[in-house]
A protein has these predicted regions:
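N-terminal cap/lid segment of alpha/beta-hydrolase-fold proteins
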Residues: 1-29
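Short beta-strand/loop motif that positions the catalytic acidic residue
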Residues: 154, 159-162, 166
């Protein structure tokens, strides 16, 4: 971070109480807002995950106001794990807070692994409510475990980034889903990368940067 960048811890009001969050932004007025959702809470996923912080930093450096937060039951956030359903409510509460702080700015919505399911569900709800995100960015979506087929409209472009050597999410399942889903995502395959993109975070950040509102 530069001296002009800001990072602040904040408490949001979620459906089950407090949501622990971090807001980052660069110098000046943000040109877009972003939210990045973290991986599975029951397997150590938090807003401090490296994929999450990499995407957040990319948004901040591009001039966005980016929010990452702990889902219910994680860290200091109140509540208990809810299989992606309650976590979607958490996301919508975070989006409402962010859009109130910077009304009218386009929203870049992202999620990693479990967080991509939450982000996709949230994107559909926002679209149904007439407030679609500008872009939905899904990293390693666990299509083998969660019902992504029920998410058939987000009213925004979708990018899917999938590592070819993913040891958690079967890559071929993601590739097949990406071809069949009506979301018609832009599929980016990352070779020589595992689920957590160890040693491959820079290529991930480069893809994300090319999909931010100012780059489209």
């Amino acid at each position: 971070m530069t001296a002009s960048d800001t990072r602040q811890t904040c408490d949001l009001q979620g459906p089950e109480g407090r949501l622990e969050a971090v807001l980052e932004k660069g110098e000046g007025t943000p040109t877009f807002c972003a939210i990045v959702c973290h991986p599975h809470p029951l397997f150590g996923g938090t807003m401090g995950n490296k994929v999450v912080t990499t995407l957040s930093r990319t948004c901040r450096e591009a001039g966005g106001a980016v929010l990452r937060f702990n889902f219910r039951g994680v860290g200091k956030s109140q509540g208990a794990y809810s299989d992606g359903l309650g976590e979607t409510e958490d996301l919508l509460a975070a989006e409402a807070w962010l859009s109130h702080a910077w009304p009218g700015l386009p929203l870049w919505l992202a999620g990693f692994s479990f967080g991509s399911f939450v982000a996709a569900r949230g994107a559909r709800i926002l679209a149904d409510n007439g407030r679609p995100a500008r872009h939905l960015f899904l990293v390693a979506p666990p299509v083998h475990h969660y019902d992504f087929n029920s998410i058939d409209n987000t009213a925004c472009p979708v990018t899917v980034v999938q590592s070819e050597d993913d040891e958690v999410v079967p890559a071929e399942d993601v590739f097949q889903w990406a071809v069949q889903t009506p979301l018609a995502p832009d599929l980016i395959r990352v070779p020589d990368a595992g689920h957590f993109f160890h040693g491959r975070l820079i290529p991930l950040a480069e893809v994300a940067r090319s999909r931010l509102p100012g780059a489209l």
